[in-house]
């Protein structure tokens, strides 16, 4: 089974988060909560009360307004926030190796409509890692 989640706009990146944490640990925590709240809102609207019990493979399509931000900075913090929000809303049981077997990042430019599209694919259990 496949599920789709769309998050409009963009999330803060790893450089923003690292800078906030260096300024003040509370500021970093506040930034993470703000980003998670945005993702949780999208999850509650689109995935409703979905509960996935099988392991998943996740595909992230990042649509940026331009090429200013480094790819790894966009995806690293963004994946963390999205996966934590999926666990917080109980869509996923956990974000461990057993629950998320892998992921893929794709990057695109869409100047008028930045967004993140996440495809969550259930997979059959593989050998324990």
What does each model-identified segment do?
Residues 1-129:
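Catalytic phosphate/metal-binding cores of nucleic-acid and nucleotide-processing enzymes, i.e., regions
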């Amino acid at each position: 089974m496949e599920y789709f989640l769309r998050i409009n706009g963009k999330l803060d990146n790893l450089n923003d988060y690292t800078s906030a944490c260096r300024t003040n640990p509370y500021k970093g925590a506040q930034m993470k909560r703000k980003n998670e709240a945005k993702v949780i809102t999208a999850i509650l609207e689109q995935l409703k009360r979905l509960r996935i019990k099988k392991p998943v493979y996740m595909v992230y399509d990042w649509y940026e307004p331009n090429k200013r931000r480094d790819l790894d900075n966009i995806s690293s913090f963004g994946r963390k926030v999205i996966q934590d929000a999926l666990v917080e809303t109980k869509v996923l049981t956990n974000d461990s190796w057993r629950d998320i077997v892998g992921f893929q990042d794709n990057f695109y430019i869409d100047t008028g409509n930045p967004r993140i599209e996440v495809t969550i694919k259930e997979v059959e259990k593989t050998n324990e890692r």
